[in-house]
Amino acid sequence: MKLKFDPNQQYQLDAIQAAVDVFAGQRKLDGTSFGGQETLAFDGQQLSLEAAVARGNILELSNEQLIKNTHAVQERNKLKKSDVTTDKITNKNVLAHGMNFSIEMETGTGKTYVYLRTIHELYEQYGWKKFIIVVPSVAIREGVLKNLEITREHFAELYHKPEMNYYVWDSKKTGQAREFATNDTLQVMVITIDSFAKAANIMNKQSDYGRPLDFIRATNPVVIVDEPQNMETDTRKAAIESLHPLCTLRYSATHKNPYNLLYRLTPVDAYDKHLVKKIEVHSVLSEDSYNDAYVNVLKLERKGKSRIIAHIEVDASDEYGLQRRVVKVSPGDDLAELTGRAV
């Protein structure tokens, strides 16, 4: 059975255009230009010419133009304008939350379709070719991969059949990172946050050809974060920044921090547009609200004269999603680090 997608749903087009218009005025990189090219060298040894040149994204707009564009999008969508601050080094105005942009869409309204089509729009209009989709769990990763598969023909018809590779980051195939960096076609990598958030991850380990991360960051990828409220710990935010993103586009129905909010489709909006059949509110507090912290103290025990150990039950995040588990903690332990999520 062949699935058909409606390419003309206005609310989805509005969400896509919101992200695209932030970069209005950006010159399109043509087929003879590789955009950002960075020569990769490790421990003083330069790689072969083919492997050494990272064909990456490049942004030519000034901070003033980005601020102007962002405020124009927000005004169009009746949202609060982003705060502006002064960069301490350049002494120029910049967006207070940097190049993080949020799109809020009610569950079930096609969020994944929107950001996959946004990839094609950014490629079509600006020539950007390197994209990384960061997800919080394997389950969501597999869902994104399936969406890439079933929409491929649909997007090929809309966007003149661009040559595109998409794949899941596999730590056993470190050559993927070099392929991502040096390939001059549209590249989409899907990766779980826990695959690169720790120093021990293969992504961050040195090899004879350098770290896989070094290849990726040389491209200044557009990073798309699915369910960013699950990635608000300092460790996870630092991991995303380590990718050296050109920008970070954040998609969720329940943002914890909607940095530079560009578009909002609330549950009421979705109901009014007949996108959902009804809205139900069972309780002010959800029984299983995994966006909130959960800590249950099970037992306290004393070790020696002064040391106290607590046995606590928490919701911890790993590459398989949220798992409820029991951990031992002492005074001063960082629960955010232990659980992999904001507490």
What is each of the regions a protein language model found here?
Residues 1-343:
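RecA-like P-loop NTPase motor core of helicase/translocase proteins
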